[in-house]
């Protein structure tokens, strides 16, 4: 199982939010690429990057920071946030991004998801963010009335090969990851799922591994030094 460290970008800096609330920003690194280097040294092979400004704007914003992160050797990058057109997807892939994570587009523009999967096979993932079971979009600011498992089924039908599921209510709160909810989506939709949101300790990593998930995304727990990344990677492989 993969342990995927996260970098959230705002104003070119690495930040973290609580429950996706833009008013709770904490800056952790002025130069996000240095964080990427640190994670690569610890043994991570994939980095989860979110362009928070892009998620609000509807198009990629932090391109300079993304480019710098992609230039870090030894670690691949997946990027989400504001990717809602084929030209924007193409633009970030050209920067060196390995996978794109479509969130709002996965809900509102399934046709775009299908086109992206056909044009960039194997490089398109879906980010499904939910609060109390309801999928949220536009940087978690808008509700949809849709259930996460239903969206997962639809994106699988569109050609997506993996879903990244975030419990927004847990994100940045150290309340424990929703491994059971992620496993339920994986089983019912028949698609590999990576869990995110609320990871607080190595117990969360082992819970995701025990649930048979494809991976777990770890963010604030790394920045607050609650989890040692190298130890988490070892726990996921045990």
UniProtKB/Swiss-Prot annotation:
Biochemical pathway: Amino-acid biosynthesis; L-histidine biosynthesis; L-histidine from 5-phospho-alpha-D-ribose 1-diphosphate: step 4/9
Keyword annotations from UniProtKB, A to Z: Amino-acid biosynthesis, Cytoplasm, Histidine biosynthesis, Isomerase
Localization terms from the record: Cytoplasm
Short name of one Pfam family: His_biosynth
Catalytic activity, EC: 5.3.1.16
Catalytic activity from the UniProt record: 1-(5-phospho-beta-D-ribosyl)-5-[(5-phospho-beta-D-ribosylamino)methylideneamino]imidazole-4-carboxamide = 5-[(5-phospho-1-deoxy-D-ribulos-1-ylimino)methylamino]-1-(5-phospho-beta-D-ribosyl)imidazole-4-carboxamide
Enzyme class: isomerase
Any one GO molecular function term: 1-(5-phosphoribosyl)-5-[(5-phosphoribosylamino)methylideneamino]imidazole-4-carboxamide isomerase activity
SUPFAM superfamilies noted in UniProt: Ribulose-phoshate binding barrel (SSF51366)
One of the GO BP terms on file: L-histidine biosynthetic process
Database matches in NCBIfam families: 1-(5-phosphoribosyl)-5-[(5-phosphoribosylamino)methylideneamino]imidazole-4-carboxamide isomerase
PANTHER family assigned: 1-(5-PHOSPHORIBOSYL)-5-[(5-PHOSPHORIBOSYLAMINO)METHYLIDENEAMINO] IMIDAZOLE-4-CARBOXAMIDE ISOMERASE
Protein family (similarity comment): Belongs to the HisA/HisF family.
HAMAP family for the chain: HisA
Name used for this protein in its record: 1-(5-phosphoribosyl)-5-[(5-phosphoribosylamino)methylideneamino] imidazole-4-carboxamide isomerase
Native source organism of the sequence: Anaeromyxobacter sp. (strain Fw109-5)
Lineage of the species this protein comes from: Bacteria, Pseudomonadati, Myxococcota, Myxococcia, Myxococcales
């Amino acid at each position: 199982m993969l342990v995927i460290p996260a970098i959230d970008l705002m104003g070119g800096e690495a930040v973290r939010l609580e429950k996706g609330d833009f008013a709770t920003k904490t800056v952790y690194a002025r130069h996000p690429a240095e964080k990427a280097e640190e994670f690569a040294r610890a043994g991570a092979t994939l980095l989860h990057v979110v362009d928070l400004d892009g998620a609000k704007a509807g198009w990629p914003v932090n391109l300079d920071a993304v480019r710098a992160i992609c230039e870090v050797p030894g670690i691949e990058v997946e990027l989400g946030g504001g990717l809602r057109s084929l030209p924007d997807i193409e633009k970030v892939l050209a920067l060196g991004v390995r996978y794109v994570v479509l969130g709002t587009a996965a809900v509102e523009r399934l046709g775009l998801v299908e086109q992206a999967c056909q044009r960039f096979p194997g490089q398109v993932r879906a980010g499904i963010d939910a609060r109390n079971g309801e999928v949220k979009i536009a940087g978690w600011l808008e509700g949809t009335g849709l259930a996460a498992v239903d969206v997962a089924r639809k994106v699988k039908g569109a050609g997506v090969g993996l879903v990244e599921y975030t419990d927004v209510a847990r994100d940045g709160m150290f309340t424990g990851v929703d491994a059971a909810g992620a496993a339920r989506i994986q089983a019912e939709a028949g698609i590999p799922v990576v869990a995110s949101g609320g990871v607080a300790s190595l117990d969360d990593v082992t819970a995701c591994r025990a649930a048979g998930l494809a991976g777990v995304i770890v963010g604030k727990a790394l920045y607050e030094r609650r989890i040692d990344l190298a130890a988490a990677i070892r726990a996921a492989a045990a």
